[in-house]
A protein has these predicted regions:
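Short beta-strand-to-loop elements that line the ligand-binding cleft
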Residues: 73-80, 147-148, 164-172
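A ligand-binding cleft/hinge motif common to bilobed small-molecule-binding domains
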Residues: 83-86, 99-108, 155-159, 176-192
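Extracytoplasmic small-molecule ligand-binding "clamshell" domains
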Residues: 22-99, 107
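Ligand-binding "clamshell"
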Residues: 50, 104-118
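Hydrophobic residues within well-ordered alpha-helices
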Residues: 66, 88-89, 138, 178-180
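Ligand-binding cleft/hinge of the Venus flytrap
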Residues: 46-52, 63-72, 134-139, 153-170
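Flexible hinge/capping segments at coil-to-helix
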Residues: 126-143
């Protein structure tokens, strides 16, 4: 009985997401524009040039090509990591760049197939390398770990490092800056 309930739950969720996706696509085609949320702070994927206020990067090239292929105009909407996925749910924009897949996020938004795989990595100063030879070395009382608010790395750090002190950093500040300033021993990021 429990499996049957779960099956129906997933059918309803997936059907609802499919209907929403179809209506969103219809709206994009009717309005002639696709709104894309991006942070503009993840080099080389999405970067905002402060001198021109234009966005560049690998993911920007992808959404430019998508808009061209669809025959619609591209509208870039600045966002932050903490609201990246919520912007889709709240209809602030139609799609986003750089949103890592997680089970929680998949309950409210649809995802395409990944075009590359990320790994989560810890980064620290060279003089700390002998202290941090493994993930377990980071998961200790007294160790300070910086992560960016709203990222999958934030969620991972909460699970992997329950004994460490987490410094959750809100953009536009960067978690690696906490390490450079001596306010954190390591930061958790992707391998990009």
């Amino acid at each position: 009985m429990h499996i049957l309930k779960l099956f129906f739950f997933f059918v309803v969720v997936l059907t609802s997401l499919n209907v929403l996706a179809e209506s969103r696509l219809q709206k994009i085609l009717e309005t002639g524009k696709i709104r894309v949320g991006t942070t503009g702070d993840w080099n080389p994927m999405t970067m905002k040039d402060p001198s021109t206020n234009e966005y560049k990067g690998f993911e920007i090239e992808i959404v430019e090509q998508l808009a061209e292929d669809m025959g619609v105009n591209l509208v870039i909407i600045p966002t932050e990591w903490k609201t990246l996925v919520n912007g889709i749910v709240s209809n602030k924009y139609d799609i986003s760049t750089s949103a890592s897949l997680s089970a929680k996020r998949a309950l409210s938004t649809g995802y395409t197939d990944s075009y590359f795989k990320l790994a989560t990595v810890p980064l620290t100063l060279k003089n700390n390398l002998s202290k941090f030879q493994s993930w377990e070395d980071i998961n200790k009382e007294g160790v300070k770990v910086a992560v960016t608010l709203g990222t999958t790395q934030e969620q991972q750090a909460k699970q992997i490092f329950p004994k460490a002190t987490l410094n959750i950093i809100e953009s536009p500040a960067r978690d690696f800056q906490e390490v450079l300033a001596g306010r954190a021993d390591a930061h958790i990021t992707s391998n990009i």
